[in-house]
Amino acid sequence: MIATYRESPAPGPLSSHACCVWANVAGPGGHLERVLPDGCADVVWIEGEGIVVAGPATREVLVDIPAGTAALGVRFGPGAAGAALGVAARDLRDRTVALEDVWGAPATELAERLAGAPPAGRLALLAAAVARRLDGAQAADALVARASGLLGAGMAVTAASREVALTDRHLRRRFHDAVGYGPKTLQRVLRLRRFLALAETGPSPDLARAAAEAGYADQPHLTRECADLAGLPPAALLAARAAA
């Protein structure tokens, strides 16, 4: 077994800020995880290490997980983490910071409670603690959320700006504050995600068709973007994901 990973919708009040919660346990041989950018940010508890905020990434992150290590997380969709955590998302871009630097002593206390809790109850404990902390937190930027959805569906940045009645410049500024980077970068990230979803449907992926349907100009365009964002060419990335 390489790892055991499970993901579920954010429960109760937490769902107004977060998109999901997740739990992972590395297998007996450990695991090198290639985490791809997705526009999201996570509050993550790692057994033996404490709690961190993993900010929105613009490239792949390789995480070496020792054998048997448990990790839990609360994931915030594009544009949600900054408002919920009370920090500018631009300050979290491509960074992992201790939650204590954001929340102070309550983060340390929560980490201690998680370390001492029964494994089966840890995810619920983390979700409940984050939900309490976010009670009354600022809502995410609704225009950024709407524009993110349009970009995820394949709309061009300029067209998305018009749809939300903002200039390209104003949309970029709001994206940097809320998402951590501009709409063009999020568009690239979400396009790669669309390609992977298309290519991983069915037993024999048609890379050319998946690339075209995802919105790439041609296969060289896909290859460049895949190498830049994921660190591997398309076929190698798909093979690595299939073996994980």
Where on the chain are the PLM-derived regions?
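DNA major-groove recognition helix of helix-turn-helix
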Residues: 175, 187, 225-227, 238
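Alpha-helical bundle regulatory/interaction domains
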Residues: 1-168, 178-183, 197-202, 206-217, ...
